[in-house]
Amino acid sequence: MNVSKYVAIFFFVFIQLISVGKVFANADEWMTTFRENIAQTWQQPEHYDLYIPAITWHARFAYDKEKTDRYNERPWGGGFGQSRWDEKGNWHGLYAMAFKDSWNKWEPIAGYGWESTRRPLADENFHLGLGFTAGVTARDNWNYIPLPVLLPLASVGYGPATFQMTYIPGTYNNGNVYFAWMRFQF
């Protein structure tokens, strides 16, 4: 190889290293914002929330019929939380909920949720949300070992009542579950 190829390779690697540094700097900023949002939601809640699990649905294309016939898809339970709306109109919430899982065993979950919220109609009470939740759950079939979760969130609501939902991805006969609940703000 001639010298110009070495110089080109050096500059290519150098530019990649600089880019990695910027990515980590942005990750630090994101993590700081994440922590600050959790702290503010904990210390300065605007609302207290009641959570009522509504439905669990196992994607039929991803399960054997024998399994879905045995699964519980009525996850009765409940939970409480506190939430706030930020200056951009986005929702932030801290919550704890327990519900009956697919095997009809209790599953607790607690975490933080965030949704970018839009109000597409003239009636400001109607709102749509899209975001994520990060938290910890524990399941009977995993001996109640705490498991971290990072899942998508979506919602549709009117005033203080919101139908909120997530999808748990998975493989064949595992995961691929739609889970939804009602959230009432007080």
UniProtKB/Swiss-Prot annotation:
It is found in: Cell outer membrane. The keyword Disulfide bond does not apply. Pfam families: PagP (PF07017). GO terms for molecular function: O-palmitoyltransferase activity. It catalyses: lipid A (E. coli) + a 1-hexadecanoyl-2-acyl-sn-glycero-3-phosphocholine = hepta-acyl lipid A (E. coli) + a 2-acyl-sn-glycero-3-phosphocholine; lipid IIA + a 1-hexadecanoyl-2-acyl-sn-glycero-3-phosphocholine = lipid IIB + a 2-acyl-sn-glycero-3-phosphocholine; lipid IVA (E. coli) + a 1-hexadecanoyl-2-acyl-sn-glycero-3-phosphocholine = lipid IVB (E. coli) + a 2-acyl-sn-glycero-3-phosphocholine. Its EC number is 2.3.1.251. SUPFAM superfamilies: OMPA-like. The record marks K67 as: Role in lipopolysaccharide recognition. Keywords: Acyltransferase, Cell outer membrane, Membrane, Signal, Transferase. It is an enzyme of class 2 (transferase). Its main location: membrane. Coiled coil: none annotated. The active site is at H58, D101, S102. Residues 1-25 form the signal peptide. One of its GO terms (biological process) is lipid A biosynthetic process. GO terms for cellular component: cell outer membrane. The record marks Y172 as: Role in the phospholipid gating. Transfers a palmitate residue from the sn-1 position of a phospholipid to the N-linked hydroxymyristate on the proximal unit of lipid A or its precursors. Homodimer. HAMAP family: PagP_transferase (MF_00837). Belongs to the lipid A palmitoyltransferase family. This is Lipid A palmitoyltransferase PagP. The gene is pagP.
